[in-house]
């Protein structure tokens, strides 16, 4: 059995706007379905913590950043398409690779 990686993600939003809440809800659904128990998500409101947005060079919201495992990946804007989110963060490839390796060892 292949050990699952832990994913560290940051979601940058601008307040409790409908767009921010939609991004958060969609992302939580994707993470719970695909990565239950192996992810940590930090939500950063750039209106309340602008210094964090500045440090991480965030120019638009919503922005989703995958911090770990490397490499760092970002998606800016619409997070409603599950497959685009997974591909954009290099997570779909990781999951396909792990299932191939675990499935390919049986005789």
UniProtKB/Swiss-Prot annotation:
One of its GO terms (biological process) is circadian rhythm. Keywords: Biological rhythms. InterPro entries: Circ_KaiB, KaiB-like, KaiB_domain, Thioredoxin-like_sf. Coiled coil: none annotated. The keyword Transcription does not apply. It comes from the Bacteria. SMART domains: KaiB. SUPFAM superfamilies: Thioredoxin-like. Pfam families: KaiB. NCBIfam families: circ_KaiB (TIGR02654), PRK09301.1 (NF006798). May undergo a major conformational rearrangment; in the free state forms homooligomers. When bound to KaiC switches to a monomeric thioredoxin-fold (KaiB(fs)). The active oscillator complex is probably KaiC(6):KaiB(6). Belongs to the KaiB family. The kiaA gene has been eliminated from Prochlorococcus during genome streamlining. It has been suggested that the central oscillator in Prochlorococcus does not have to be as robust as in other cyanobacteria because the former live in specific niches of the Earth's oceans; they divide exactly once a day and at the same time. Thus gene loss and changes in kaiB function compared to other cyanobacteria, can occur. Component of the KaiBC clock protein complex, which constitutes the main circadian regulator in cyanobacteria; it may modify the ATPase activity of KaiC. Has 2 forms, fold switches to a thioredoxin-like fold (KaiB(fs)) when bound to KaiC. This is Circadian clock oscillator protein KaiB. It comes from Prochlorococcus marinus subsp. pastoris (strain CCMP1986 / NIES-2087 / MED4). The gene is kaiB.
